[in-house]
Structure formats: structure tokens, C-alpha cells
């Protein structure tokens, strides 16, 4: 399928395990290089978390050693904490963006967990977290080495006390819970993220979260949806960075890859994702043959006007523009497509 396979190495937030790995970094780097060669992998992504500024230089040295041991064509990615305010202590301070960037192909900014398990309810990934994290990264590494991490999950809190308090929940599970318990959803235009509220009654069937049935009560869910993810995707173009990655595959909703395909082809039309002509629309849009009605709508089933047909044919045939002081037609003066209409007419179209 022409897909690069780059597995990730993680300590799963275990500080002692991460420290032990860095203490034996020469040996570990050798083992990773051997595995990449043995399984014909395309590289490795290093995701060591929950260390401190005390391990910063060791972390960088590990990536340097790994780069020396891997062939140049193999990819090295490093997952780094989102650091919108340039903190140099604690686990955010364990990543030297500038030095890591010199020895790796990209830094994957984990722009999520703004609020976390055991903490107060709140956004997992606000738009400001994503944007400020990109801005900080750009001050340290080239734009072509930056990936924006976008979550495919949210977190759920029970109002008051009791399980769960900020447990992770996939975007797919959110849809199920909201549907099952007839929940309500709202969208915050400031953080550009959705929040859902569900009420579980004593008599309701108890669905499970992380294997544990949820009890009666009111729950708040902060998560991601199509609108919030699309807004983050726009940041990729705004700052012209390498691209995006997500945590984690399998937690996304069924329609996610429909609009990711549109985004990867440079358009954000909300109304063509499952349309029978989607691929043709994308191709025509990429070739600049057709435009959208707005930036986010294409209106694929709307009838085509003569003006739109003229503009499309002029672009498709790459006809040189023609303008007349007095148009042959009495009803096109000042029309947005006047130039295209004149051009089409001059070519007997």
C-alpha cells in the first residue's frame, strides 16, 4: 500500500523505565537499529515521557546515538510534549527541541492532554494549545520537521465524585454514549472544541468505559469532532509545517478518513465526503477547474449555472482572457463571471 511503517518506542509514562532506558542508551540504540534492519522497517519514533530536565541531555544523546546507528534513509521521529509557554522544567523541560531536531527527521508535538486523568474537567486539545505549541516549535526547529499531534480521543468526568474522573475515551465511544443516553453536545467557539453531557439513570443499561460499567449520574465529556479537528488541520497550512499525526489509530470516528482525504488534497468541503463524485471533485479542484461555493461547501447536487459553466470551461481549456468594452450580452455587465463569459463567447463556446 506504499505506507511507511515506523513503530514507536515508549516507556508508557513510567519514569524509572525511561531513566533506565537512557542509562543504557548505547545498548538500546543498537537493539533498535538491529530490529529496524531485521524487520525492514522504515524507522522508529521515540516516545519517552514523564522525565525531567535532569534527563534532557541524556535524551538528546540517545537520539544522536540512534541517528549514528541507523542508515540515513531510515526515519527517526521524536514525540515531544506540547510546550506553548517554553517551560524548561519538569517533563516539558525534558525535551530540547533544538538539539533533538538536529538528530531527527521530525518532532511530533503531543498537543493534547491539556486536562488529564484525575484533574478538573476541561478541554483535551484547545485550538490555542495547538497553535501556540506550533509557534514555540518554529522558534527552535525548521518547519519541515514539525508534526502537529491531534487527538482522536477525549476524557470523561462524573459530576461530583466517583469513577471516572478524566479517564480517556475514544471519539468513537463518545458517539456511542451520547446516542445511548440521549446526551446533548455544545461547541465552544473560544477553545474550538466540543463538550457533551450525558445523564445515566438507575434503570439504564450500563455501558463500560475501560472495562468498568458507569453508574447513575451526570457526566461531562470533552472530546474532538470533525469541526475541531478540521480547525487544527488548517494550522498545518497556516504555518506550512510538515504535517500531522494522531493518538491513536482506532479511536477515530468512521468518517475521519473521509475528510482527511479531502484535507490532504487541499480542500475542506463538508458536503462531498461520501458523495459518489467525491474523487472527481477532488481531482477537478486540485487542477483548478472548479471552485467551491464557499471555502467549506461545494454543493455537489446543485444545478450548474451558465456563468459557472463558462468559468469552468475557460479554466479547463486554459483559454486566454478576453474582455470587451461592450459585451455582446446585455445582462452580464458587472457580473462576477463577465470576463469568463466574454472569453468563452470569443472562442465560440
Identify the meaning behind each predicted range.
Residues 52-181:
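Substrate-binding surface in catalytic domains of secreted glycosidases
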Residues 1-49, 53, 65-83:
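Substrate-binding cleft and catalytic face of glycoside hydrolase catalytic domains
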Residues 42, 105, 242:
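Receiver (REC) domain switch/active-site residues of two-component response regulators
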Residues 46, 107, 148, 236, ...:
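Conserved, mostly hydrophobic/aromatic
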Residues 152-235, 261-264:
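Glycan-binding loop/region signatures in secreted carbohydrate-active enzymes
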Residues 15-19, 265-278, 286, 291-339, ...:
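Feature responds to low-complexity, polar/acidic, surface-exposed segments characteristic
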Amino acid at each position: 500500500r506504499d505506507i511507511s511503517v515506523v513503530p514507536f518506542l515508549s516507556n508508557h509514562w513510567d519514569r524509572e523505565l525511561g531513566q533506565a532506558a537512557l542509562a543504557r542508551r548505547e545498548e538500546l540504540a543498537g537493539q533498535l537499529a538491529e530490529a529496524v534492519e531485521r524487520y525492514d522497517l522504515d524507522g522508529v519514533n521515540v516516545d519517552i515521557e514523564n522525565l525531567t530536565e535532569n534527563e534532557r541531555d541524556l535524551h538528546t544523546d540517545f537520539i544522536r546515538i540512534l541517528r549514528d546507528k541507523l542508515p540515513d534513509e531510515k526515519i527517526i521521529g521524536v514525540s515531544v510534549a506540547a510546550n506553548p509557554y517554553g517551560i524548561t522544567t519538569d517533563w516539558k523541560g525534558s525535551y530540547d527541541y533544538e538539539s533533538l531536531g538536529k538528530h531527527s527527521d521530525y518532532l511530533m508535538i503531543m498537543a493534547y492532554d491539556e486536562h488529564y486523568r484525575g484533574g478538573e474537567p476541561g478541554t483535551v486539545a484547545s485550538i490555542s494549545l495547538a497553535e501556540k505549541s506550533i509557534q514555540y516549535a518554529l522558534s527552535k526547529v525548521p518547519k519541515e520537521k514539525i508534526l502537529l499531534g491531534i487527538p482522536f480521543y477525549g476524557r470523561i468526568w462524573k459530576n461530583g465524585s466517583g469513577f471516572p474522573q478524566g479517564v480517556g475515551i475514544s471519539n468513537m465511544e463518545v458517539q456511542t454514549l451520547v446516542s445511548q443516553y440521549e446526551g446533548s453536545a455544545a461547541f465552544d467557539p473560544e477553545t474550538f472544541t466540543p463538550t457533551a453531557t450525558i445523564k445515566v439513570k438507575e434503570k439504564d443499561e450500563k455501558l463500560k468505559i475501560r472495562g468498568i460499567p458507569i453508574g447513575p449520574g451526570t457526566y461531562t465529556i470533552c472530546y474532538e469532532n470533525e469541526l475541531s479537528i478540521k480547525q487544527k488541520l488548517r494550522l498545518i497550512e497556516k504555518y506550512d509545517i510538515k504535517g500531522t499525526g494522531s493518538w491513536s489509530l482506532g479511536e477515530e470516528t468512521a468518517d475521519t478518513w473521509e475528510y482527511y482525504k479531502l484535507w490532504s488534497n487541499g480542500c475542506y468541503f463538508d458536503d462531498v465526503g461520501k458523495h459518489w463524485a467525491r474523487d472527481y471533485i477532488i481531482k477537478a479542484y486540485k487542477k483548478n477547474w472548479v471552485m467551491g461555493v464557499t471555502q467549506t461547501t461545494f454543493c455537489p447536487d446543485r444545478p450548474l449555472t451558465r456563468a459557472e459553466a463558462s468559468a469552468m470551461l475557460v479554466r479547463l481549456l486554459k483559454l486566454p482572457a478576453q474582455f470587451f468594452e461592450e459585451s455582446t450580452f446585455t445582462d452580464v455587465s458587472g457580473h462576477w463571471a463577465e470576463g469568463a463569459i466574454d472569453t468563452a463567447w470569443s472562442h465560440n463556446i
